[in-house]
Every structure is written in structure tokens, then in C-alpha cells.
């Protein structure tokens, strides 16, 4: 994979994948965000560099550089400003655009935008260099819209490539777009009306003036307001649901009536605990809390700006306070969200000085009212959290912002327990007490959690999931011994041979794990013979020796918790098993195998964050019903830390009832990993070369594949565990069998198919093999049907990447998976 190097200054350069010897790549695309002179009041440049595009997307991009500052200039310029925006307003006037900026508002063609977070972007219609103006009512809206525009422009450049960045397109598409504006995006203006609601359209000339073309307009807010007006109420004493007429018809109405009763009862139980028996919260809230039931997470994100089981409203004029996507297992999350609304209505967060200075305490207060957390009372999680050494520190719990290494799954019950520990019977009294705590006092309380009763674990859940008539993979591999080692590790759960596909998430709202397009992709995979998928969350590490890990998943375009849970549930609904497989994404052009700390202090810090990351997802894997769990992926430089791995495996076993594996790197982890006997499956990302000869024929590839299979069989027998190919793949490039872990170069579907046919022909289905997960497909490939067909076909046919659907390799994979 091509690496990217983040500079410390205002520019970040990402090199394109290396080509052949002496090959000179194309000039990098330079995207420039020009901020006003004296930007200190708004901090626009700093906010752009703290944004999602700069921090999360740019390191993945191919051939893109971003410049930010008052003198920034590039292939495309974005002039960024905040009302009254003298710089941008002057440019708009000189271009004759229907844009007017006042002290507190931005007007476009007579429409006034003055709400916090709203912003307008317009393209200047003249000049040889494409220039956009982005003006916000406030800095937050301006930066958010500029960030959105950067994603659009980078995608137009074809920079996302295999990263699944967005709407497609490639450099050839851009170059073919002749004329003075090769960066035409299909719209000339874009308005951020709400976090996910946009207005877009094009200019036209009328009587010598530039005006909005009504035929080209798309106005999300107007459409949403029209749809929201059609929603019907299901009234209750304390909670009123809003749902579409179709959803309230037939059996859907009975389901929603049960939901309304549950939520109404939850509010009735929680309200008296806010301020006490004489408080106004004992009376029926006036008006009731209005909750909109969304059809899916994509619609929820468009209406609120984020996704989750239940999230607050964000659009101007919203009738609802909360928007939820219904699943019967998520009632606990709806109760927590309702508790948050009760706290806000009572003014307790503000009165306690809590929001926004202590977000973890705000979450904890809501959970203290709601009670349950991922299937059990929140207090029952505390012994496991303490024993697994994943508790936050006092400083982290009292921090004024949510750190990216923090885990909502793991830390919210701790915050609720801290609230509960305070004197008083009401939330108001407890918040008054917790407000006075210091980090040292919280640390002292946290130290006492280790003395609590042992965690109950998942023994009952494991027994409930077992299928006594099935033959376990471990028994198939070892001739009947389905136990682990002599220390009594858990046996492998009963699973058949896994015909798997590594299903990476496309980083887009419409194509993510949470999106309806996922169902179409799962259908397609099942049709080709797959019966399992792996799902992959990510943590980010800035470099191989950086001790901090940052949990990703902060927005709908990334691998969110709710998206992963939804994907597991949908896979099960389609009859597919799931391998839940956390990855670490390492910056600085590196890869997970390079991760190694410089000293013991850094190792302790890294392991603390890694435990938090893995156990966060182990809880989600259990809750969603995943079938297998991987404790790591290709972390070769950490394998010498055997004790830390042993402790992590033990902690995972207490919450996850299914088989455990580790996705070892093909180049040495099979032999070096010290913990195979503690796991149920030996796992390997199997990118073994089949031949060093670029011109190898079928016979030579078959011999190379036989040698690979012999090595795999030896590893399985040496560790007395079945072996799972956690990844196996070949890119669609010339001579892919010489270095299967690489992509890029000269495209060749034929060589990709030949390599798969050789390996699978030698592999067969021996009893020691638990299955394979082919690398890779994307969750949103079905959503690509909405993209321009010609560009999509060109990209699929010519990209030398690992995708196999729709290529010759699909037939080779389907043939292997059809064998029984």
C-alpha cells in the first residue's frame, strides 16, 4: 500500500504508488484553503488541520497535497471566511454572484442563512483556475463545509482509489473533462443547511446576470421538511413517536405501540430521580418528548448529522427531539438517550456546570438514570473493566472534551458508577457533589473498583450458543479433541468450513456498514457461494513508535460502533457468519508489523490503549452476535510481549463466547506468535508468493501453491489448532503471484484469476483448514450502481487492486467455494 508522509507545517504530501524503475509519476494535485489575513480570531487554518479531511482522509490519499493559510494557492483554491467575510464578499461581488454577506448572516439568491453552523460555498464562474468561496455564519459551519468540499474535490481527482472514499472518478475522468474548469463537480453552489442537509445547484445566465438555475436545484432541508410534515404521531403521555404512514400500517403499528409504551414507561421511571418527589419532573413532561422513527441510518444521518441508536435533532424547525432507528435489542440505548433529554429539559447539565466541560459525566448521568448497558446493569461491568485494566483515569473522566482514545462502551458505566457513588438520592444532588471532585479523588475511588466481586463472564451465553449436534472445527483438526490446552482454554465453537469474504467498509454515507446498500452486497456475496464475512474497525496510530491509539468511528463515513453492530445483524439475517476483526492503521507510511515502542513506559501506554480498543470491540462483537473474534492483525513487533497478550486474551474470553483467533502476518507470525495455544484458531493473512517468476505458468504456480499449503498444514498440526486464512488475496495486476501483498502496476485480471485458481486448487478442504476470507470486497459496491456507468466500468476494469467482484477472479473463488 502506498504510504503518506505528514509534514509538520501547512502542507501534507501523499506520494502516489511507486511504478516501474525510472518511472515519473504525475504531478501532485494541490488543494489550497486560503484563510483571511489575521485569522487568529476564528482559527480557521487550525480548524481545517484538525478536521476530518486533513487528519483522517489525507494520509490515505494518492497524489494529493493540501495547503492551508493566507498565501495558499493550488490547482483549486478555496477562499474560507466567516461573516461578515470581507474577502469572500468582495470576490462574490466582482464575479456578479447572487451572494450577500451581512454581520450575522449569509444570503444566497434571496434565501437567508443565519443559524449557527450554516454556511454557503459558491464557485466563481470566471477564470482559468477553479476557485470556491466558502462563507459561514460561524467558524464551525464554514470549516465543516470546506471540509466537505475538500472530500468532493479529492474524489474528483481520483485520489481515494481503493480507500473507498466517495463517489468514484479517476485522473483519466478528470483529464477528459476539457475546458477551462477541469474541476467541475456537477454543482456551482452548496449550502450547509444542517450537518447533513445540503442545498446544491448550478448557475445560469439570465439577462446578463448570474442566477440560480431552478431546474438544477436539490434542497435537502426543503425535502426533509416536506417529508417530516407527512409523519404521523403516535401520541403517549410522556413520549410521542413520529413515523411514516407506511410504518404505522399493519404489523408495524403494533411494533411501534410497544416501543412507545416502553419509552413512556422509561420516562415515568426516570423522571422522579432527577430532582425528587416534589419536583416538576414528577409531572408529565409538557410537552411530551417527541421521537422520530427513521427508516434507516442514512436517513437518520441526513436529518441529524450523525448516526446512532438514538441521536438528538439538529435541523432547524425539527419537530422531534430524538431520531432513532428501531431494533428491539437497542431499547437500553433509547432509554439512555431519553435520559439525556430529561437532563437537558431539567437544566441539570448547565446547573451542575457539567456540559460541555465534562462529557463523560454527562453520559454517566444519563446511564445512572437508565440503568442497563449492553445487556446487564451497568454496575455489573465494573469488576471486568477493573480486572482488564481498561478503566479511565480521574483526569480522563473529568476532562472537558472527549479524547479519541476514550471508549464510550467501556467508560460510560464507570462514569455512571461515579455518579452513583456521590451522596444524595437525586441526580441533582449527586451532580452537585461530583462537580467538586478532583482527578486525584476520582483516582482513589477507581482504585477501589478492583476489590469488587468477580465478573460473571459469559459462561451461560456460551452454553446457550453451542450446538451439540455440530462438529467443532477443533475436533475436525485434532481428531476429536475439541478442548484447548491443558489449562482449560475454551474450545472452539461449532462452526462449519467458512467460505468468507473480507468486507471492508466504503467510507461514505450511502455505502457504509450502516447503509441499506450493505444488504445488496451481502446478497451478491451469498450468490457467489460465500457464507461468512469479516468486518473491520480501525484504530489510528500516528507512527510505529507512537504509544497512543485513537479510536476511529467519529462520523458516518467511518467504521462506527452502530454501523458494525448493524452489519453483524444484517449478515446474520442473510445467513452469513461474521469474523469481527479489529485493525490498527499506522500513519507515517508504515504498517502494523512495524509497531514497536522505544521504552517500557511507551509500551505500557500502548498496551493500555490497545486493550481499550480491542475490549471495546469485544463487547460490541458479543452484543451484535458475531461468530468469531480476532484479537489483533499483523502486529509482528508486539509478539515478544507474551504476558500482555495472555492477559488480553483472558479478558476477551470473559466477554466474547465464540472462537478467538489472531490474524498473523504471512512472513513470520505463524512461527513467532507465543499465544496460539490460548486461541481456538491459528490465523494468517496468507499473502505467500507462489513463484518469483513473473512469467510462471500453470505448473509452476501449482508447485508453489503446494509448498504454501504444506507450510500451512505444518503450522496447524504444530499448534494443534485448525488454521483460518483470515485474509487471502491477489491483486488484479501483472504477475501478482510474485508479491501477493502488493497492488498497483499493470492491470491483469487474468493473472489475478490464475493465482487464485492455483492456490485454491492446491488448498482444497482438508480437515485442518477452518476456512478462508478473500481480500476483498467493499460494503458499498452495490451503492456504486448510482454512479456514472462508464466511469465505474473503466475503474473496475483497469484498477490493479484487490477487488474481485465482476472480474475473472470471481469465477475462480466461486468455484472453490462451491466445492463441498
Identify the residue ranges that each predicted region occupies.
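Short, acidic/polar
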Residues: 511-525, 607-620, 666-675, 756-762
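Juxtacatalytic substrate-recognition/specificity segment
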Residues: 78, 235-357, 376
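Glycoside hydrolase catalytic-domain groove-lining segments
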Residues: 560-561, 566, 573-574, 581, ...
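Aromatic-rich peripheral "rim/lid" segments of glycoside hydrolase catalytic domains that contact
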Residues: 464-465, 470, 490-495, 513, ...
Amino acid at each position: 500500500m502506498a504510504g503518506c508522509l505528514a509534514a509538520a507545517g501547512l502542507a501534507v504530501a501523499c506520494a502516489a504508488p511507486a511504478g516501474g524503475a525510472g518511472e515519473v509519476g504525475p504531478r501532485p494535485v494541490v488543494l489550497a484553503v486560503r484563510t483571511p489575513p489575521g485569522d487568529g480570531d476564528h482559527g480557521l487554518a487550525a480548524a481545517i488541520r484538525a478536521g476530518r479531511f486533513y487528519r483522517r482522509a489525507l494520509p490515505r490519499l494518492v497524489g494529493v497535497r493540501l495547503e492551508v493559510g493566507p498565501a495558499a494557492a493550488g490547482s483549486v483554491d478555496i477562499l474560507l471566511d466567516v461573516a461578515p467575510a470581507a474577502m469572500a464578499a468582495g470576490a462574490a461581488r466582482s464575479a456578479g454572484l447572487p451572494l450577500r454577506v451581512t454581520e450575522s448572516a449569509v444570503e444566497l439568491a434571496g434565501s437567508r442563512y443565519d443559524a449557527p453552523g450554516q454556511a454557503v460555498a459558491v464557485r466563481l464562474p470566471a477564470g482559468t483556475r477553479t476557485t470556491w468561496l466558502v462563507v459561514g455564519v460561524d467558524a464551525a459551519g464554514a470549516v465543516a463545509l470546506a471540509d466537505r468540499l475538500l472530500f468532493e474535490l479529492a474524489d474528483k481527482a481520483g485520489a481515494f482509489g481503493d480507500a473507498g472514499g466517495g463517489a468514484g472518478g479517476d485522473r483519466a475522468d478528470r483529464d477528459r473533462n476539457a475546458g477551462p474548469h477541469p474541476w467541475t463537480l456537477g454543482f456551482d453552489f452548496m449550502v450547509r443547511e444542517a450537518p447533513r442537509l445540503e442545498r446544491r445547484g448550478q448557475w445560469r445566465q439570465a439577462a446578463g446576470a448570474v442566477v440560480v438555475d431552478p431546474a438544477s436545484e436539490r434542497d435537502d432541508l426543503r425535502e426533509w421538511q416536506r417529508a417530516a410534515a407527512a409523519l404521523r404521531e403516535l401520541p403517549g403521555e410522556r413520549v410521542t413517536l413520529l413515523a411514516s404512514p407506511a410504518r404505522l400500517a399493519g404489523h408495524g403499528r403494533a411494533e411501534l405501540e410497544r416501543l412507545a409504551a416502553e419509552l413512556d414507561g422509561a420516562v415515568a421511571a426516570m423522571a422522579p430521580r432527577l430532582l425528587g418527589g416534589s419536583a416538576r419532573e414528577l409531572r408529565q413532561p409538557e410537552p411530551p418528548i417527541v421521537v422520530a422513527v427513521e427508516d434507516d441510518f442514512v436517513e437518520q444521518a441526513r436529518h441529524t448529522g450523525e448516526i446512532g441508536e438514538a441521536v438528538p435533532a439538529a435541523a432547524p424547525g425539527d419537530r422531534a427531539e430524538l431520531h432513532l432507528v428501531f431494533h428491539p435489542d437497542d431499547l437500553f440505548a433509547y432509554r439512555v438517550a431519553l435520559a439525556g433529554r430529561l437532563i437537558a429539559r431539567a437544566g441539570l447539565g448547565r446547573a451542575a456546570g457539567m456540559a460541555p466541560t465534562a462529557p463523560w459525566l454527562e453520559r454517566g448521568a444519563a446511564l445512572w438514570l437508565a440503568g442497563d448497558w449492553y445487556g446487564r446493569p451497568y454496575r455489573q461491568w465494573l469488576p471486568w473493566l477493573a480486572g482488564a485494566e481498561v478503566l479511565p483515569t480521574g483526569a480522563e473522566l473529568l476532562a472537558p472534551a472527549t479524547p479519541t482514545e476514550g471508549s464510550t462502551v467501556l467508560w460510560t458505566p464507570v462514569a455512571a458508577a461515579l455518579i452513583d457513588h456521590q451522596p444524595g438520592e437525586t441526580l441533582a444532588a449527586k451532580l452537585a457533589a461530583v462537580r467538586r471532585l478532583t482527578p486525584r479523588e476520582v483516582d482513589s475511588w477507581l482504585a477501589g473498583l478492583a476489590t469488587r466481586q468477580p465478573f460473571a463472564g459469559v459462561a451461560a451465553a456460551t452454553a446457550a450458543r453451542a450446538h451439540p449436534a455440530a462438529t467443532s472445527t477443533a475436533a475436525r483438526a485434532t481428531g476429536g479433541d475439541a478442548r484447548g490446552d491443558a489449562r482449560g482454554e475454551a474450545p472452539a465453537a461449532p462452526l462449519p468450513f467458512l467460505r468468507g469474504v473480507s468486507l471492508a467498509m466504503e467510507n461514505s454515507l450511502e455505502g457504509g456498514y450502516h447503509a441499506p446498500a450493505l444488504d445488496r452486497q451481502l446478497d451478491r456475496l451469498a450468490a457467489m457461494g460465500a457464507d461468512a464475512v469479516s468486518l473491520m474497525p480501525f484504530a489510528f496510530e500516528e507512527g510505529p513508535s507512537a504509544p497512543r491509539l485513537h479510536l476511529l468511528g467519529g462520523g458516518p463515513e467511518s467504521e462506527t460502533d452502530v454501523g458494525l453492530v448493524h452489519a453483524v445483524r444484517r449478515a446474520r439475517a442473510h445467513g452469513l457468519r461474521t469474523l469481527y476483526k479489529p485493525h490498527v492503521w499506522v500513519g507515517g507510511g508504515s504498517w502494523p508489523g512495524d509497531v514497536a515502542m522505544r521504552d517500557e513506559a511507551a509500551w505500557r501506554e500502548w498496551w493500555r490503549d490497545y486493550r481499550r480498543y480491542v475490549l471495546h470491540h469485544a463487547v460490541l462483537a458479543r452484543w451484535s452476535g458475531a461468530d468469531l473474534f480476532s484479537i489483533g492483525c499483523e502486529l509482528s513487533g508486539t509478539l515478544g510481549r507474551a504476558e500482555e497478550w495472555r492477559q488480553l486474551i483472558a479478558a476477551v474470553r470473559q466477554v466474547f463466547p465464540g472462537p478467538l483467533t489472531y490474524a498473523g502476518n504471512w512472513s513470520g507470525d505463524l512461527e513467532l506468535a507465543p499465544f496460539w495455544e490460548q486461541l481456538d484458531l491459528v490465523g494468517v493473512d496468507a499473502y505467500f508468493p507462489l513463484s518469483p517468476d513473473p512469467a510462471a505458468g500453470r505448473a509452476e504456480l501449482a508447485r508453489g501453491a503446494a509448498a504454501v499449503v504444506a507450510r500451512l498444514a505444518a503450522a496447524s498440526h504444530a499448534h494443534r489448532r485448525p488454521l483460518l486464512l483470515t485474509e487471502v488475496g491477489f491483486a488484479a495486476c501483472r504477475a501478482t503471484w510474485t508479491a501477493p501483498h502488493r497492488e498497483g502496476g499493470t492491470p491483469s485480471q487474468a493473472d489475478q484469476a490464475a493465482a487464485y485458481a492455483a492456490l485454491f486448487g492446491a488448498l482444497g478442504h482438508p480437515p485442518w483448514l477452518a476456512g478462508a476470507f478473500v481480500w476483498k470486497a467493499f460494503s458499498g459496491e452495490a451503492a456504486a450502481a448510482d454512479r456514472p456507468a462508464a466511469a465505474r466500468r473503466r475503474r473496475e476494469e483497469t484498477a490493479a487492486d484487490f477487488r474481485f467482484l465482476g472480474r475473472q477472479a470471481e469465477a475462480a473463488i466461486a468455484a472453490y467455494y462451491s466445492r463441498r
